[in-house]
A protein has these predicted regions:
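A conserved FAD-binding loop/helix module that cradles the flavin
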Residues: 14-21, 25, 106, 112-178, ...
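Protein kinase-like catalytic core scaffold
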Residues: 2, 108-111, 204, 229-231
Length: 293
């Protein structure tokens, strides 16, 4: 069983330290994981499906397989549905541009979901649909509150439904480094989680990132806390996707490490790892020894 990926790592968008936990748990499942590699051809033969590969460095190889699964994303169908015949502007790639009310360039036509752009996620599309429906209903009913609805989500969580699951939301550590954003990291290993140990699945990790810029924590009720608001977070472990919503809410509400750490989480649960990670960032966690200076 081989996995072929054109990019330099699996699960692009997630921090590499989270993905490495998944890789460690699953390396026995695969014969090869070929990174920086393109699939350039495939032919059916009596022996099986013969596939040709080419590395980004020009190296060529091939393999023969019983089955091949091609998973390369989706293409917007704005041109195929002939939206332009209704006057709707469609981009060269097939996307349809909308404003924050999900309205196209034609005032009475709305669009939501994958066709309006990334990220192509069902939970994003649902919220976009709510906005469009409220705006339409508000205008028909003369309800100004409904008619003023807008899609203004600060963050949209992502989940890789693997085993273990990988989930992340907001700013990632890799993005923070690339953008020169100083962050305070709180990392809680599930090896210190009673529930994870009892489940026999303590390989997981919960990570939270807080604003650690010089001006962080100077206002908005965060003065004297030594850090600013939460900017992002990620988890790898069983049911990570079920818990990432709490981190998304914390970002939307502008919470800091004290807010999250002092929120009482039920014990023993995997979800309390979020509170523990906040305590690690704040330096008040008694479940994990402080890092040596």
């Amino acid at each position: 069983l081989d996995v072929v990926e054109m990019m330099d790592g699996l699960m692009q968008g997630a921090d590499r330290d989270l993905v490495k936990v998944w890789e460690k748990m699953n390396k026995h499942r695969f014969d090869n994981i070929l990174l920086k590699t393109k699939t350039v051809g495939a032919q059916a033969t009596p022996e099986g499906i013969q596939v040709q590969f080419e590395g980004l460095d020009g190296t060529k190889s091939e393999g023969t397989y019983d089955l091949v699964l091609q998973a390369v994303g989706r293409t917007p169908n704005g041109k195929k549905i002939a939206a332009d015949k209704a006057g709707v502007a469609v981009t060269d790639r097939g996307f349809i541009n909308v404003d924050i009310q999900m309205r196209t360039n034609v005032p009475h036509i709305f669009a939501i979901g994958d066709i309006v752009g990334q990220p192509m996620l069902a939970h994003k599309a649902v919220h976009e649909a709510h906005v469009a429906a409220e705006v339409i209903a508000g205008e028909l009913q003369g309800n100004k509150e409904l008619a003023s609805a807008a899609f203004n989500a600060r963050v949209i969580p992502s989940v890789a439904y693997t085993d273990p699951e990988v989930a992340w939301v907001g700013l990632t550590e890799d993005q923070a480094k690339a953008q020169g954003i100083k962050v305070k990291k709180g990392l809680f290993p599930w090896a210190a989680s009673g529930r994870a140990i009892a489940n026999g699945r303590d390989e997981g990790v919960t990570k939270l990132l807080f604003d650690d810029s010089p001006e962080a924590g100077s206002g908005d009720g965060h003065a004297g806390r030594g850090h600013g608001k939460i900017l992002g977070g990620g988890m790898v472990g069983t049911h990570a996707g079920d818990m990432i919503g709490e981190i998304a809410l914390a970002i939307e509400m502008g919470a800091d490490a004290v807010d999250i750490g002092k929120t009482i989480h039920p014990h023993p649960t995997l979800g309390e790892s979020i509170g523990m990670a906040a305590e690690v960032a704040h330096g008040s966690c008694t479940d994990v020894p402080p890092a040596r200076k």
